[in-house]
Design a protein with these regions (language model features):
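Short, charged/polar N-terminal "headpieces" of proteins
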Residues: 1-63
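Short, surface-exposed, charged amphipathic helix/loop patches that serve as local interaction elements
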Residues: 48-132
């Protein structure tokens, strides 16, 4: 059981390291619903100022995620990912929000995808709580 806990903590640490390298900071996991991540993303806005902007993304059901990722058009996938996962700020659900910073858009899509695929990384003792 100790080894499993250590592996989970290592995965968590690796995930957080990946995020740091993508200009993401202050990551907080929220157990609401299927899980949510709150974080700050360094990005350039329409005002040409580069600041840390707060975001909240929420995990969706596996069925919903697979329907989104089955699209063939990458732009359509990106738009649907933003609209489906971003809870706050609401204006970030529109791809136009990222017009001045394509790197921030790619980072957001990567964070969404990574979080969706690794839902329990942030829940300490998840296996113990489920009786495993």
């Amino acid at each position: 059981m100790e080894n499993k806990k250590e592996q989970q903590e290592l995965k968590n640490k690796e995930f957080l390291e990946k995020l740091k390298n993508k200009n993401v900071s202050n990551v907080i996991f929220k157990p609401d619903g299927l899980g949510a991540l709150e974080f700050d993303l360094m990005m350039t806005g329409k005002d040409f100022k580069t600041i840390e902007r707060p975001f909240r993304i929420e995990r969706v059901s596996t069925d919903t995620f697979f329907k989104l990722s089955s699209e063939k058009d990458e732009l359509a996938i990106g738009k649907k990912l933003l609209n489906t996962f971003i809870a706050q700020p609401a204006e970030a659900r529109d791809i136009e929000f990222f017009n001045m910073d394509q790197e921030a858009l790619l980072t957001m899509v990567n964070v969404i995808t990574e979080f969706q695929q690794t839902p329990f990384l942030f829940i300490k003792n998840f296996g113990e709580n489920k009786g495993n």
